[in-house]
Amino acid sequence: SIMLAFNTNTPMKVCLWRGEIDTIMTPYDSVRYYKYFLRSSFLVEDPHTGYVKAYVGGPDFRYFKWDAVTQQRKQVGSTIKPFLYTVAMQNGYTPCDEVENIPRSFDLPGDSVPWIPRSSGPKDYHGKMVTLKWGLAQSENYISAWLMQMFRPSAVVDLMKRMGMRSFIDPVPSIFLGTSDIKLEEMVGAYSTYANRGVYTRPMYVTRIEDKNGNVVSRFTQQIEEVLSEDQAYLMLDLLQGVVLIGSGNRLRR
């Protein structure tokens, strides 16, 4: 039977972080073993040229034939919030504008009970006036919910599409919680827009292909689009710096 085969010891070669080893284990145990592997990815892009400088798609490709940079989609969590704040900057808001830090409710179709996002920031600031810069720095859901009430979810999705997002993003109020599954390649390209003065540059892996004699077989041109004004990009850089200087990302400075 299948279960008998899956629980029968079998000689096999398995992957370790330090290399390969020959061992004996059941196919069932080998599946469990590989499930314990950390499946992370890493991408570094020059924001001005789009040239990819570093790329890690996952562990050994001989054993994990799946690219976590260009194939894998994951929920992005609060890293999606800057795009909501970008819409606000496009509509005349500034990092210094103040908002009351209180719960916000959303009436959902077919649901008699309104949805109220929970706070994710310091409780001693509840009910106080806080700046948008503070709201993003602390990743406070109350402020993100207020922004979502001010602007349609579809406006955020439209902006993200212009910033290179090709994954499906459902235009619902909970979008600011990062419920959408997005590729790392798309997120890196979108974030690079802020560092490139508002110009989106798609990550570029190959500039040209040559044959063995050095003759150019094919050339590739960069895909760029001006998404934000330089002033809007500057405001967003100021907001993002606040995350590291005074907010939830300050541990990066230690």
Residue ranges with predicted function:
Residues 1-46, 55, 61-66, 80, ...:
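A penicillin-recognizing enzyme superfamily signal
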Residues 31-40, 63-83, 96-101, 129-130, ...:
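Short active-site loop at a secondary-structure junction
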Residues 33-52, 80-86, 90, 125-150:
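C-terminal substrate/ligand-recognition segments
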Residues 41-45, 53-55, 97-100, 134, ...:
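Structural recognition of the beta-strand scaffold that forms the well-ordered cores
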Residues 49-50, 73-101, 135, 190-194, ...:
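Active-site SXXK
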Residues 61-63, 74, 89, 95-96, ...:
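Proteins synthesized as precursors that undergo proteolytic processing into mature forms
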Residues 93-154, 200, 212-237, 241-242:
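Conserved catalytic neighborhood of penicillin-recognizing serine enzymes
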Residues 113-119, 152-189, 198, 202-205:
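Mid-domain, small-residue-enriched loop/turn segments at the edges of structured enzyme/sensor domains
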